């Protein structure tokens, strides 16, 4: 029984560690922050990256519009959700959460 519990705990931590999500925005666009971002489940939410203060992150991830949400699996980008021309996020929490779930299920 201990082995099963240990395996379950290990599997859970490995699964959650595989998916990371980052929210990119800028202070000048803080009115359009994605308020539901930190409530995403089954992933590690990296938090908000201000591209005005972190130009290297902007260049590395090719952020062209803010806000942008990127889902990473094992360190590689697997999905991207970007704002429209009015700098507002079009994707809903449900759409982003569905993509996280799809990425987790793709391993099975």
Put a short name on every predicted segment.
Residues 51-58:
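N-terminal post-signal-peptidase region of extra-cytosolic proteins
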């Amino acid at each position: 029984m201990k082995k099963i519990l240990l395996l379950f705990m290990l599997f859970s931590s490995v699964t959650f560690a595989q998916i990371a999500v980052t929210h990119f925005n800028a202070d000048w666009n803080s009115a359009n922050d994605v308020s539901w971002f930190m409530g995403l489940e089954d992933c590690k939410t990296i938090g908000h990256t201000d591209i005005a203060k972190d130009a290297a992150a902007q260049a590395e991830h090719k952020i062209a519009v803010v806000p942008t949400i990127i889902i990473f699996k094992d360190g590689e980008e697997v999905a991207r959700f970007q704002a429209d021309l009015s700098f507002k996020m079009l994707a809903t929490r449900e759409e982003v959460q569905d993509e996280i779930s799809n990425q987790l299920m793709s391993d099975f």
